[in-house]
Amino acid sequence: MAFDVEAIRKDFPILKRLVHGKRLVYLDNAATTHKPHFFLDMLCAYFNTMNANIHRGIHTLAEEATARYEESRRKVAAFLGGADPRGVVFTRNATESINLVAQAWARPRLRAGDEILLTGMEHHSNLVPWILLARQTGAVLRHLPVRDDGHLDLDSLDRLLTAKTRLVSVIHASNVLGTINPVRRIADAAHRMGALCLIDAAQSVPHMPVSFPDLGGDFLAFSAHKMLGPTGVGVLVARPETLEAMDPFLGGGEMIREVHLDRATWNDVPWKFEAGTPNIAGVVAFASSLDYLTRLGMDAVRAHAVELTRYALDRLRALGRLTLYGPADAESRGGVVSFNDDRIHSHDLSTLLDRQGIAIRAGHHCAQPLMERLDVPSTARASFYIYNGKDDVDALVEGIREARRYFKLPSP
């Protein structure tokens, strides 16, 4: 389907506000996305009509809240190409999902000298948990390098995968370069060496069709807030048998079957990984976000991202005096464009754009090793979503021109 951006924008109340008297042009969607009124309405409806704790009551409100919570789990599984709902674990965010794998799967299994293969474009959320684990276990971290064109150096994959490799953890779509990595190829290579594969899908699940069974990974992590949902809700997906072989990550209520003074037994999966009271309202309302994206169609969401990214790359290149990072073609990347004007610091540019109502991100984007690879301290980053249109890209380009005028710099 063709996107009617103006119609979509009407579903997002925040897009009606002005920033410094200007229309809000929100281009920071890789950090978080705005929420449609369907989500906000469901959030209010939950508290107004069924607010109760789940899985631990037999009264009507508790049963209704539990049913809606578990319905959201089934919708997540369906959204991911028919994953098994028993393998869908709700966490606080993608970061916690990755830490869960590091501590509940990897830590008991890794020994000194075992290897974990990462890449040079990982978000800190898929670096720091493994740095901590390496300190705890004596495991060795290895890294698949990033080529100058923004793609991974897959020619090095077979050399870096060894008999000592226990896990490969790879970002699906870079939050800096936009690069979409061939995770199926990487997962298959890992499996041939007897290793498991974790896919950080925080920047892919919101923007393209993602089928957990088809990707071939053993674990998949993402966050709800990057796809029209709430903060405080993340997802870890795995096969139920993989989760069953793992001990819990956190202990407390909800994740137990029986507790005695000196011992305990665990609940079935996925609940043995959901200790304590979760963000019930957020999970319930997240189903509305998934319904909204399903109605739009993820193929259409992806096509819109490619079209808008291509337009942005063309317009920014025509502007001149900008360095653009990542693959040259829009088809190889998500809706993320990072760039620098070597005469204006990215933080200054972001500040001046904000005065024009334009929200971008400036900094290292929680990817400092990648910044070192690019030999820059930071970049400016524009990232798009379903409510962005070519007029937003035009506003960004004009905003950069205005920033150059502010500094009395020539601009084509």
Show where each model-derived region lies:
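Pyridoxal 5′-phosphate
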Residues: 1-412
